[in-house]
Design a protein with these regions (language model features):
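Short, well-structured N-terminal submotif of metal-dependent ribonuclease cores
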Residues: 1-41, 56-65
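Acidic, PIN/NYN-like endoribonuclease modules and their adjacent C-terminal/linker elements
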Residues: 3, 78-79, 106-137
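Short beta-strand scaffold positions
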Residues: 6, 40-41, 80, 100-103, ...
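Alpha-helix capping/helix-boundary segments
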Residues: 10, 45, 84-85, 105, ...
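Noncatalytic, solvent-exposed loop/strand surfaces
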Residues: 16, 23-28, 51-54, 64-66, ...
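Acidic catalytic patch
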Residues: 17, 43-44, 64-95
């Protein structure tokens, strides 16, 4: 199966469906799923998704519904942030000057040799050498 790592910015755009990035997220991810692809996310993405959706809407139940939707998707697989991944993320955070959670997505992409889908411009610019980010056009 063709896989990619997807960060919270792309997940939120995909799940909410009405963000500025939603059309791009839908185009990329629906084409990926239609081609038999799957996505990998670190388990922290679940909390990031719930928080982003609930805060943006002001409705906690929408955040929880987004998590339920994510859990039911057969082509989305989570990975636990263990000591090894956390250590790699810490190294990336310090050397690339990226935020902590962003470093986790970059570390996962690097560790698994997978491309990363993100709408975070800084994260795309500061990705370590060898980490491919998926073009948005």
């Amino acid at each position: 199966m063709n896989l990619m790592v997807v960060d919270a910015s792309a997940l939120v755009a995909y799940v909410r469906g009405h963000d500025d990035w939603s059309p791009v997220a839908n185009r990329i991810l629906e084409a990926h799923f239609a081609a038999g692809g799957g996505i990998r996310i670190p388990n922290i993405a679940v909390a990031e998704l719930a928080s982003a959706v609930a805060r943006a809407s002001g409705q906690p139940e929408l955040g929880l519904q987004a998590v339920t939707h994510l859990a039911r998707h057969r082509r989305i697989v989570t990975r636990t942030v263990d000591h090894g991944l956390a250590s790699l993320a810490a190294d990336i955070a310090a050397t690339q000057l990226v935020r902590g959670c962003d470093a986790v997505y970059l570390a996962m992409a690097q560790d698994e040799g997978l491309p990363l889908l993100t709408f975070d411009h800084e994260q795309r610019l500061r990705a370590p050498e060898g980490v491919q980010t998926i073009p948005l056009d």
